[in-house]
Structures are given as C-alpha cells and as structure tokens.
C-alpha cells in the first residue's frame, strides 16, 4: 500500500468502487419500487380514455372523507354566505342542473372510448356553499363538496360562464384528479428519498426536483386542467347552459388573475391562449352535447 508523506492512507480504488456500487444499488432499488408502484396502480379512465395513476389502496370512500375533512376546515376558516340569500340559491340552482347531467355526460364520453363509465360519483354527497371573499375562485372536492367565492361573480358575469367554471371544478372531482396528484406525490417522495439515500447533495437534489417539476409534474397538472375544461364544458352544455360563454370567461379570468392567484387558478393552469384555442376546438362537440342532452327548447 502506498503511504503519503503525512501518513494518510490513499483510498484504495476497490473501496471507491464498492461505495459507488452501493449508491447505484440504492438508486436501482428505489427505481424498481417506483416502477412497481407506477405500473401496479395504473388504470384507464373511461371518461378521458387516458391511463392514470391512482393508488389502489386509496378507496373512493377514503378520498371522500379526505374531501369532507378539507371542506369542513375551509368552511370553518372562511365566511360562508347565508344559504337562503339569492346568490346562494342561484349558485345551488346552477350546481343542481350540472349534477343532474353527470351520469349522461360520463356515459357519453366513456362511450367515445368504447368503455363503460365508473359511476363512482354515485356515492357523492353533493353540497355547494358560497364563500364571502374577493378571490375569483371555486372548487369541488372529492365526494362532491363545492364552494364558489363571491369574487368569482363579477368575473363570471352571467350564469352560463358560472356554469362553465363550476363544471370545470366538478370535472376535477369526477376524474379523481386529487387522488392522481396524491399518487404523483408518492412517486416524487420515492425519488427524493432515493436522492437523499444515495448521497446526492441537497443542491443536486434540488436540481433534479426542479427538473422533474418542469418536465413532469407541471405538464401533468396542466393536463388535468385541459381535461377538466373539456368535461366541464360538456357538462355545462348538457345542462342547457351556453358553452360559448367559456371563451370570454377565460379571457376575463386571465385579466383578473394578475398578481394574486388562488390555488386553483395558479400556474398549473394552461397558458390562456392555449386554453382558449382548446375551448374553441371543443365548441362543435359542446354544441352537439347541448343538442343531445338539453331537453329545454333553445
Ligand atoms: Zn382546474
């Protein structure tokens, strides 16, 4: 063995390779677990025809109770508007019309992919509250718990546009986007753990995570937005609202969402120009859905 003048031992080449091998071994183990998790939890969503990742150990009931818990927490922190006031009744009226068309629209979209709908929203306990707030926001949690913020009313301007936003939110819950995000987070954690255990320094880890965010998680979130736009538009059209209001609505939304943005309308939302192009492309189909499912004479 070579000895340096200060008496320190040179690391022998064999040892270095062993450490490197261990690192790669750990990374491979995590990669194998990640791949196993990914492939064993993938299903096809009949409504979108897309392969999605939802943890099989998370039941619809678990998801509903998580939604309910979050809902109660939000309502206890915010200022819900008296349900007997006209604004609350109007919003509930829109919600009821949309909810009444969920089964028809799910079945029609699933049929386009040659599939049967899951009808998993059958067990939803729908509820809608109006929250007194400046935010131009709305949400629908797993299990059908919805809220519309009063700040959305002047941006929506009319019931057709309001129905487009609420349809979009309902679609997120129907498509189980929350559960999909949870599965994504699980995979991200596996990646983080692998990074930490294989001895990546925090800076390297951050770089990898940032790359994943831009390359993988963010487009994934945008895809959810695009899916919710489509399913929501079909719901609004089937419930006899005018889907063409979607275009001016998202234009107004783009203008109002300058500085502060609420969680739902954050950077995960598609670029406004792309979104409007997508909506315009969907318009013939939306009008066809209205023809088919709206019993009201136009
Ligand atoms: Zn959304």
Model-derived features with residue positions:
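Membrane interfacial helix-start segments of signal peptides and signal-anchor transmembrane helices
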Residues: 15-23
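Generic alpha-helical structural context detector
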Residues: 96, 164, 189-192, 196, ...
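Extracytoplasmic and endomembrane cell-envelope/extracellular-matrix remodeling and assembly machinery
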Residues: 229, 242-298
């Amino acid at each position: 063995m070579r000895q340096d003048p200060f008496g320190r031992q040179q690391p022998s080449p064999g040892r270095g390779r062993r450490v490197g091998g261990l690192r790669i071994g750990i990374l491979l183990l995590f990669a194998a677990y990640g791949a196993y998790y990914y492939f064993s939890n993938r299903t096809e969503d009949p409504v979108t025809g897309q392969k999605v990742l939802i943890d099989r150990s998370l039941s619809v009931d678990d998801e509903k109770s998580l939604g309910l818990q979050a809902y109660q927490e939000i309502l206890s922190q915010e200022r819900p508007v008296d349900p007997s006031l006209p604004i609350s009744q109007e919003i509930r009226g829109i919600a009821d019309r949309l909810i009444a068309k969920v089964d028809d629209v799910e079945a029609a979209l699933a049929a386009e992919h040659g599939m049967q709908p899951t009808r998993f929203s059958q067990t939803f306990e729908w509820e809608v509250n109006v929250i007194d707030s400046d935010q131009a926001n709305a949400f629908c949690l797993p299990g059908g718990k919805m809220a519309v913020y009063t700040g959305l009313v002047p941006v929506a301007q009319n019931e057709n546009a309001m129905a487009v936003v609420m349809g979009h939110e309902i679609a997120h819950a129907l498509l189980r986007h929350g559960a999909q995000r949870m599965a994504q987070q699980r995979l991200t954690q596996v990646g983080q753990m692998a990074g930490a255990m294989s001895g990546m320094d925090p800076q390297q880890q951050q770089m990898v995570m940032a790359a994943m965010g831009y390359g993988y998680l963010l487009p994934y979130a945008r895809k959810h937005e695009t899916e919710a736009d489509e399913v929501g538009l079909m719901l609004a059209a089937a419930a006899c609202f005018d889907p063409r209001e979607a275009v001016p609505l998202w234009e107004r939304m783009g203008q109002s969402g300058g500085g502060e943005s609420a969680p739902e309308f954050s950077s995960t939302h598609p670029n406004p120009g792309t979104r409007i192009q997508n909506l315009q492309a969907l318009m013939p189909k939306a009008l066809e859905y209205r023809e088919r499912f709206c019993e009201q004479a136009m």
